[in-house]
UniProtKB/Swiss-Prot annotation:
Record gene name: purM
GO biological process, one term: adenine biosynthetic process
Compartments where located: Cytoplasm
Keyword annotations: ATP-binding, Cytoplasm, Ligase, Nucleotide-binding, Purine biosynthesis
Name of the featured protein: Phosphoribosylformylglycinamidine cyclo-ligase
Enzyme type, top EC level: ligase
Length: 333
């Protein structure tokens, strides 16, 4: 176990500074289209919404991040395409939109056919799970800028205007259903890599809790695509949705100004316990950085909670309160 108490900022990602940078950029984006295609919401929610008559078009863009460096280390790239799709699709689902089309952006140091085939394998698998088409993309060779590769994409979704879920219906007393993640997903990997680099382990070592797989392979487990949320929306009265990604539970502030009391959270997978132990990472930093076993949240009246839990394989993990974010006795701030 590390004697240090590593943080995300120690690894090079300062969430506070990142938020200030994003805010500065957004302040410059002053032009707004009018009429058909005009934005229905401001910038900052899970997806941007555009006026399209009875419907809203929803747009998201995201990438795999530094998880690709572990793929390079393991020389296995057939899952990062799933991650790329998942990070975008899950953000669409978090505002109630159905994904319909995707375009990818692959920036390369150099071209390798075998590598590209594996990237494509993951992309098509993710698209199949999401029930949408990949309609194009861009491949750029940038040897002076890129070392290795970077993978990102943009996703288009559609939702009836009266079915958009932005969190305005969330009320005190609503129940929170937590839906399990498959592990670390695609956030916090700069800290993950820092922990492994400073530990006694390598990516090719067996997991200490499961000798049947290597640490690197465990960390490459694809991000879960929560497409069953569409079934929840049809069957239940949903008040709010949340995709737990970068900044962990802190991102819940974009859903509602009310509070979240996670009195019975899902148990974090063993990979989180391993990373926390090896990096000496404090509980608060873990929940500020990772999904900690809960990759998606559904907020709804108690009458529909059991139904939502059954559809998603989740469980009731908490309730909406007046203020704050709390996981048992831990205050997230």
């Amino acid at each position: 176990m590390s004697e240090k108490h590593l943080t995300y900022a120690d690894s090079g990602v300062d969430i506070t500074k990142e938020e200030k940078t994003v805010k500065t950029l957004i302040e410059k984006l002053s032009y707004v289209r009018k009429g058909m295609g005009a934005p229905l919401t401001g910038i900052g929610h899970y997806a941007g919404l555009l006026d399209f008559g009875e419907y809203a078009l929803a747009l998201t863009t995201d990438g795999v991040g530094s998880k690709v460096l572990i793929a390079n280390e393991m020389q296995r790239w057939n899952t990062v395409g799933i991650d790329c799709i998942a990070m975008n699709v899950n953000d669409l689902l978090a505002i109630g939109a159905e994904p319909v089309a995707f375009v990818d952006y692959l920036a390369l140091e150099k071209h390798e056919e075998g590598f590209a085939a594996q990237i494509g394998e993951g992309l098509v698998k993710g698209a199949e799970i999401s029930r949408m088409s990949i309609v194009g993309g861009e491949t750029a060779t940038l040897p002076e800028i890129i070392k290795g590769f970077d993978l990102a994409g943009t996703c288009l979704g559609i939702v009836r205007k009266d079915e958009i879920v932005e969190g305005e219906k969330v009320r005190v007393g609503d129940v929170i259903v937590g839906v399990p993640s498959t592990g670390v997903h695609s956030n916090g990997y700069t800290l993950v890599r820092k922990i492994i680099e400073e530990s006694r382990y390598s990516y090719h070592d067996p997991c200490p809790y499961d000798n049947s797989k290597m640490i690197g392979d465990e960390l490459l487990t694809p991000t879960r695509i929560y497409i069953e949320i569409l079934d929840v929306l049809k069957a239940c009265e949903v008040h709010g949705l949340a995709h737990i990604t970068g900044s962990g539970l802190l991102k819940l502030r974009r859903v509602t100004k009310l509070g979240f009391d996670f009195y019975d959270p899902l148990e974090p997978q063993e990979i989180f316990k391993f990373l926390q132990k090896e990096g000496g990472v404090e509980d608060l930093e873990m929940y500020r950085t990772f999904n900690m076993g809960m990759g998606f949240l559904v907020i709804l009246p108690e009458k529909d909670a059991a139904k939502a839990a059954k559809i998603t394989g989740g469980k009731i993990v908490g309730k909406i309160v007046e203020s704050g974010i709390r996981v048992k006795d831990l205050v997230i701030e």
